[in-house]
Design a protein with these regions (language model features):
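Transmembrane-helix boundary/entry motifs in multi-pass membrane transporters
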Residues: 36, 97-125, 156-166, 264
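Juxtamembrane transmembrane-helix boundary signature
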Residues: 74-107, 119-133
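Membrane-interface "cap" regions at the ends of multi-pass membrane proteins
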Residues: 1-68, 214, 232-240, 261-268
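Extracellular loop-to-transmembrane helix junctions
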Residues: 58-90, 111-114
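Membrane-water interface regions at transmembrane-helix termini and the short interhelical loops
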Residues: 61-64, 89-91, 106, 114-116, ...
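Hydrophobic alpha-helical segments and their helix-loop junctions in multi-pass secondary transporters
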Residues: 136-145, 177, 198-226, 241, ...
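Helix-loop junctions at the membrane interface of multi-pass solute transporters
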Residues: 28-32, 45, 59-61, 100-106, ...
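Hydrophobic transmembrane alpha-helices that form the core helical bundles
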Residues: 113-155
């Protein structure tokens, strides 16, 4: 544990509980700070590699930029996001406080309600819904491959535009995500440690397939979309990409203390 990592005394913890703070809002104890650099690496890599992100990056080439320019813009955007998250995460890694306490220390108990609502209801829930829906489609494809008749269950029944097989896959995938969330940081660390290497196996495999299918790196990096918007200024296109990447990471960036509060040190979360 770093020397500059602050710890809450028993008296301070008692005072916080008397003010209505539950166990989830209390600063992490030294025993709870178990996340090292490897845990954060697998956590963020797992968050980066997902289908909605790939679809968004693929759509950027319609702004009139080449694939190489899009890659450069995404890398620069990632540096901006990483800098913001590292700086904002110090509050959690140093004091062991979660996002809710971080907000209250800045805006007060009343002032913290609005940013907490915006982060929770607008950013987190919307993004969670998108990821869950996308994951459920992947699960539906897998179930359809092993059990083709599953795709015919329910006939023409629909619920908010979802057929019964789609609804079942969505519910199953949603329950899996909720179960992992209720498991806490220990379950999350174990899950990401197992899943992240598998993600890289898939990514490397897809990369090899894409290079072969595209005829090599040179044709891929020089590819121009026929339906691209040619009227967009390149600088404006870069700004659009910057804004898109930063917006995607606004929720985890704002609430990064929920993760860094369990960091062994500030160096580990950086």
């Amino acid at each position: 544990m770093e020397k500059n990592v602050s710890q809450v005394t028993a008296q301070e913890e008692t005072a916080l509980k008397a003010r209505g703070y539950n166990e989830d809002l209390l600063p992490s104890s030294p025993k709870q700070r178990t996340m090292g650099a490897r845990n954060f690496f697998t956590l963020w890599m797992g968050s980066i590699h997902n289908i909605p992100n790939y679809a968004a990056v693929g759509g950027f080439i319609f702004l009139g930029l080449s694939p190489l320019q899009v890659m450069l813009a995404v890398v620069l955007s990632s540096f901006i996001v990483a800098t913001f998250m590292n700086l904002n995460g110090v509050a959690g890694s140093k004091y062991g406080i979660p996002f809710a306490m971080h907000l209250q220390s800045t805006y007060g108990s009343l002032g913290a309600k609005l940013p907490g609502f915006l982060r929770g209801c607008v950013a987190a829930i919307a993004w969670f819904g998108l990821q869950t829906f996308t994951g459920s489609l992947a699960l539906l494809i897998i179930l359809g491959k092993f059990w083709p008749n599953f795709l015919e269950i329910g006939g023409s029944f629909q619920f908010f535009g979802l057929r019964l097989p789609e609804l079942m896959a969505f519910t199953l995938f949603w329950l899996l995500n909720v179960a992992i969330g209720f498991g806490g940081s220990k379950i999350l660390n174990r899950f990401t440690a197992i899943l992240s290497p598998l993600i890289y196996v898939v990514i490397i495999g897809l990369t090899i397939w894409a290079i072969r299918a595209g005829g090599g790196l040179t044709p891929i990096l020089s590819y121009q979309v026929s339906g691209a918007i040619r009227s967009v200024n390149p600088l404006v296109a870069y700004l659009i990409i910057f804004n898109s990447v930063v917006a995607v990471w606004s929720a985890p960036g704002a609430s990064v203390a929920d993760f860094t509060k369990n960091a062994r040190s500030t160096r580990a979360q950086v």
